[in-house]
């Protein structure tokens, strides 16, 4: 799906223009209201700086948290405006509301190169309902629209889809363009062999992805809590490990489909067991056919790590979505950390394209200090999953075609 992007617009298109940019500033805060991870803010900087340098008037729209259509003082974008001001080295004003006469007066008074952040669009319930009247009010701030919020592109909301009815051109920002290039590219025209590593605790949340990847991948490695549903489906004892009883048939069907399609589906052969779900639990390594009693699996074992590493060494494109174990507990983080290190090395030394597809895998890679070594780290959890499932993202579909 080829969409117009900011890179196709120059100063003649942008100078003096009021540009509404949808960004993803949904960042984590601590109890003191301070930002603990500004990755998403930094990810939007290239688009914002390009607009500043091309003398546009920049109006940013973002959501924060789930205020349920009401003003919530704890969900104001004040800390975001402060951090963005620091990163840009210039003042970023924040409106009291994203729509209304006062906000419009602020956007109308901008000079070329100024940046204005509209207050949390989700303070209005109309945002998530994709209400066109509300979208029209948002659009009235600007002459044109840029979507740079990949993390919200799978939502058909007023600020991601509705506004495109009233602003033209509507184009992709640099971040959105990069996300589509890597994720869409990995699915549509990857360098092969193509491998996917799929982890996480539940098969149910990854059904669509696994099903879609079976049509595209040469190898699929499965880790995380979901492996125990596959083992139970094979008739193995999994002790107290997490199992989705209603997904046993599905797990069997996925294994059968992989076999029929000639896709190499790798499941761990050994696991790290714990006697309780706790960072201080007693642990032991066990083959998958020797799990019993009150033990539960919380990570993949050392033999499985080696098998996965050997399989990955043959690949040219690797997509990773979901951790291999409970990486938040250091005792059960070895599988996830080993995969992260392997991907970083393959990316650095073998020119393998490594894509970290959002969510917990990103947190794991950042915790390991390896984010910079990957080819691409996706900023969207749900959005990257839906793209990998082959779904159309409403926020992308709404943009002007190239």
Curated annotation (Swiss-Prot):
Transmembrane segments: none annotated. Keywords: ATP-binding, Cytoplasm, Glycolysis, Kinase, Nucleotide-binding, Transferase. Substrate binds at residues 24-26, 40, 63-66, 122, 155. It is an enzyme of class 2 (transferase). The keyword Nucleotide-binding applies. It catalyses: (2R)-3-phosphoglycerate + ATP = (2R)-3-phospho-glyceroyl phosphate + ADP. Its EC number is 2.7.2.3. InterPro entries: Phosphoglycerate_kinase (IPR001576), Phosphoglycerate_kinase_CS (IPR015911), Phosphoglycerate_kinase_N (IPR015824), Phosphoglycerate_kinase_sf (IPR036043). SUPFAM superfamilies: Phosphoglycerate kinase. The keyword Phosphoprotein does not apply. Its main location: cytoplasm. Disulfide bonds: none annotated. One of its GO terms (biological process) is gluconeogenesis. ATP binds at residues 206, 297, 328, 358-361. It is found in: Cytoplasm. Belongs to the phosphoglycerate kinase family. Monomer. This is Phosphoglycerate kinase. The gene is pgk.
